[in-house]
């Protein structure tokens, strides 16, 4: 219901037209729930994967939950946890989560990925290298 109303506004038409060409687009002034609704509508119209950049992991998690509620498959790409000193017991949960999101992106199972700015600045393996070293059971 809300998507139909949103798609008839001139602002939606303008941002949808700007996404027709390659490159980034920025949006300011909407509350988080409004942004999630707009992004979900744009993703459904364009069929492109959304990359939503947030200030931190908490915001990314909240945004991914909002997008899931609106019918998209979304995940959070967490930042890498650096260990600069020897530690007795270090978990690899964040590494596994990062690999899981990369695998879902490479496999086409995600409509959106929410990325904290810190994670966006960290290196990842190139897609062809990732797929070459992936084993599906």
Language-model features: where?
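ASCE RecA-like P-loop NTPase motor cores
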Residues: 1-137
């Amino acid at each position: 219901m809300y998507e139909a109303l949103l798609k008839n506004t001139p602002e939606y038409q303008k941002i949808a037209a700007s996404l027709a060409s390659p490159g980034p687009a920025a949006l300011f002034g909407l509350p988080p729930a409004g942004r999630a609704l707009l992004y979900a509508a744009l993703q459904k119209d364009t069929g492109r994967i959304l990359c939503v950049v947030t200030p931190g992991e908490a915001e990314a998690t909240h945004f991914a939950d909002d997008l899931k509620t609106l019918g998209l498959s979304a995940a959070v790409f967490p930042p890498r946890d650096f260990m600069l000193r020897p530690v007795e017991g270090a978990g690899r949960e964040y590494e596994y989560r990062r690999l899981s999101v990369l695998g879902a992106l490479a496999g086409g199972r995600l409509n959106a990925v929410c990325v904290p700015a810190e994670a966006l600045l960290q290196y990842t393996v190139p897609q062809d290298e990732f797929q070459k070293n992936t084993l599906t059971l």
